[in-house]
Amino acid sequence: MTLEMMGSMDLDQIVADAQQSFEQAADITTLENEKARFLGKSGALTELLKGLGKLDPEARKTEGARINVVKQQVEAALTARRQALADALLNQRLTAEAIDVTLPGRGAGAGSLHPVMRTWERVEQIFGSIGFDVADGPEIETDWYNFTSLNSPENHPARSMQDTFYVEGKDADGRQLLLRTHTSPMQVRYARMNRPPIKVIAPGRTYRVDSDATHSPMFNQVEGLWIDENISFADLKGVYTDFLKKFFERDDILVRFRPSYFPFTEPSAEIDMMFEQGKNAGKWLEISGSGQVHPTVIRNMGLDPERYIGFAFGSGLERLTMLRYGVQDLRLFFENDLRFLRQFA
């Protein structure tokens, strides 16, 4: 569908079709499939927006405004149907779990740490035992720290690797603000405030436009960084392999490093692990991204890349938690279902 076709296209009909499709969706899965027809990467409205670049500036402004109004109406209908389905599901659950108020009361139960927080604290403890500091940084980050300082300048193709939540407004220097897409900006922030040798991990929340059984719009990540004059890839392999064995409390773990690409490391590697025993025996499981810190990043830290070298890695805390406890769906961590959470108390 292109803008050349808009002469015969009734935008009101798109709204009507979307409202009807959403209203007829009997469950969330069907609703998300219908959403893709209109708002997905190849959806009707998305295709129209892509075609705006072919118009002259005045026409682009006019047509863009019309399409955005329609997009807002479609999104409003989608939100309303999502809420209606959620309400119906809740009412169904409440009916099934009706409480008999004549039964004796229950005593107050003690709370416990969320499984992801258990992982967070365990990671800090393990790396702290081998001399790593723990650092924290802002979740609303500047475009420069999140991308440019990490060897992804404006229009660099690596920026297309992740969809980003941008924030209205700019910082004091006029730089674009966004919700950080990884904890890697702490590499540069920490190194600018501390002199080598640098050994630090930076756990924290990160944000990307993604949501399915293995991805969440918000997820927790831990960044690791070691900078000194003689740090090699062998140090990375030794440190991370030792971490995995301590984290999973078993020695039957094989680790491999697959060549990969990240703009902020060179060489780069994906880290996979495999248990020699148990239900996951013989399966390679992706666990982390890693590599030697790129000279450009070291230079942006205010250090001389001819003198200093180091390694970095980034691991998802939910991913580690899923593997440790055998959880199949990442979204379970965010639903606050006590029946699920009590298993880890």
Swiss-Prot record:
Its main location: cytoplasm. It is found in: Cytoplasm. Keywords: Aminoacyl-tRNA synthetase, ATP-binding, Cytoplasm, Ligase, Magnesium, Metal-binding, Nucleotide-binding, Protein biosynthesis. Its EC number is 6.1.1.20. Mg(2+) binds at residue 266. Binds 2 magnesium ions per tetramer. One of its GO terms (cellular component) is cytoplasm. Its cofactor is Mg(2+). One of its GO terms (biological process) is phenylalanyl-tRNA aminoacylation. Pfam families: Phe_tRNA-synt_N (PF02912), tRNA-synt_2d (PF01409). GO terms for molecular function: ATP binding; magnesium ion binding; phenylalanine-tRNA ligase activity; tRNA binding. It catalyses: tRNA(Phe) + L-phenylalanine + ATP = L-phenylalanyl-tRNA(Phe) + AMP + diphosphate + H(+). PANTHER family: PHENYLALANINE--TRNA LIGASE, MITOCHONDRIAL, PHENYLALANYL-TRNA SYNTHETASE. Belongs to the class-II aminoacyl-tRNA synthetase family. Phe-tRNA synthetase alpha subunit type 1 subfamily. Tetramer of two alpha and two beta subunits. This is Phenylalanine--tRNA ligase alpha subunit. It comes from Burkholderia lata (strain ATCC 17760 / DSM 23089 / LMG 22485 / NCIMB 9086 / R18194 / 383). The gene is pheS.
